[in-house]
């Protein structure tokens, strides 16, 4: 298991492991039997975090976890999310008072539990006033529906605003942010990581998702070739992932990073995971998988420790070229 420290989150009795099992593939490209095998492997390896969302596989992911987790519920930090349109909400905006309550109640029903440990606001709702969202958060927390609040895909200024509203409305502050971060997606470093480290963020933790860029950082995909089975080809989110990553500049960066990995004598996927996991700004990394081999490889990479300084420097050179020469707006 990875040597990075576990993360203590307020009100949650189980410490969050530095690797967290992402389950978005469960019920999509991974069937129930394989999901059970992957969950067993993860828990046996010391992973305590299990992450899902109400929209994953149309709710099937939560239903599968509801069948698999009951006997092990006290061993895990169970997280789900709401904030993307879902039938449970009955047409209400995702983060409205009615929409948020309906979404969480639907998740709890599928998960077969009366509460989750960690409840994320999945993405900003550009219709609902944030004060309404945080008032709903306060109500649900008071009812014991969740133990701690997280946010995902939120800019630093939005999180700061939610923290202000939390204090005004006696709601729980967000204690962790789940953000897109990998060797090809480093925008988080431009502002969010500085905010999270500042006292004004009240000790906000950071969990990175898409560590392998949906599989692009495994080197299995090639520009100009059909993706075949997997996240970019056959999953429910294939179109969204192609929009995010299927670009000439990113394929060129992958080729350069593959050379870096080859020079260091490690697989490209291991390079990507070790680079992310051992950054000072990273508290936990979400790892998804579609099979036991992938999960085993991720666990082995995480146990290998930090990358050498020269390899880190080579990775940063690729990242700098991806950013380009455009100057920052802030100082």
Where are these regions (language model features)?
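N-terminal binding-site loop/beta-alpha segment at the start of enzyme catalytic domains
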Residues: 1-76
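Acidic (Asp/Glu)-rich catalytic clusters
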Residues: 10-15, 44, 66-77, 108-112, ...
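N-terminal small/glycine-rich loop or linker at the start of catalytic domains
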Residues: 10-26, 79-92, 115, 120
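Active-site mouth loops of central-metabolism enzymes
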Residues: 22-33, 86-101, 122-128
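Acidic-and-aromatic substrate-binding clefts and catalytic sites of carbohydrate-active enzymes
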Residues: 27-31, 53-62, 125-129, 156-157, ...
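Short, acidic/polar
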Residues: 30-42, 95-111, 159-164
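Active-site groove signature of glycoside hydrolases
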Residues: 108-129
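Beta/alpha (TIM)-barrel catalytic core signal, keyed to glycine-rich beta->alpha loops juxtaposed to Asp/Glu
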Residues: 128-318, 322
């Amino acid at each position: 298991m990875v040597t990075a420290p576990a993360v203590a989150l307020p009100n949650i009795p189980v410490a969050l492991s530095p690797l967290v099992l992402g389950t978005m593939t469960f019920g999509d490209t991974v069937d129930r039997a394989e999901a059970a095998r992957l969950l067993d492997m993860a828990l046996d390896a010391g992973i305590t975090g299990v992450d899902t969302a109400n929209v994953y596989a149309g709710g099937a992911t939560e239903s599968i976890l509801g069948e698999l987790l009951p006997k092990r519920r006290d061993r895990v930090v169970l997280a789900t999310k709401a904030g993307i349109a879902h039938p449970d909400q009955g047409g209400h905006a995702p983060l409205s008072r009615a929409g948020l309550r309906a979404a969480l109640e639907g998740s709890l029903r599928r998960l077969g539990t009366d509460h989750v440990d960690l409840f994320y606001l999945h993405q900003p709702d550009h219709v609902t006033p944030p004060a309404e969202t945080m008032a709903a958060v306060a109500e649900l927390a008071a009812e014991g529906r969740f133990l701690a609040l997280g946010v995902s895909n939120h800019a630093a200024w939005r999180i700061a605003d939610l923290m202000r509203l939390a204090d005004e409305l006696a709601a729980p502050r967000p204690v962790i942010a789940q953000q897109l971060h990998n060797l090809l997606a480093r925008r988080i470093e431009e502002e969010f990581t500085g905010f999270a480290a500042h006292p004004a963020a009240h000790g906000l933790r950071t969990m990175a998702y898409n560590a392998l860029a949906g599989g692009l950082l495994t080197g299995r995909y090639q520009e100009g070739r059909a993706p075949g089975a997997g996240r970019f080809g056959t999953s429910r989110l294939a179109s969204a992932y192609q929009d995010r990553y299927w670009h000439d500049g990113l394929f060129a960066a992958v080729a350069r990073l593959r050379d870096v990995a080859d020079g260091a004598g490690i697989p490209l996927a291991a390079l990507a995971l070790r680079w992310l996991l051992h950054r000072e700004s990273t508290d936990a990394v979400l790892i998804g998988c579609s099979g036991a081999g992938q999960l085993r490889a991720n666990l082995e990479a995480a146990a290998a420790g930090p990358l050498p300084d020269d390899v880190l420097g080579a990775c940063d050179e690729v990242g700098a070229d991806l950013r380009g020469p455009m100057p920052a707006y802030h100082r």
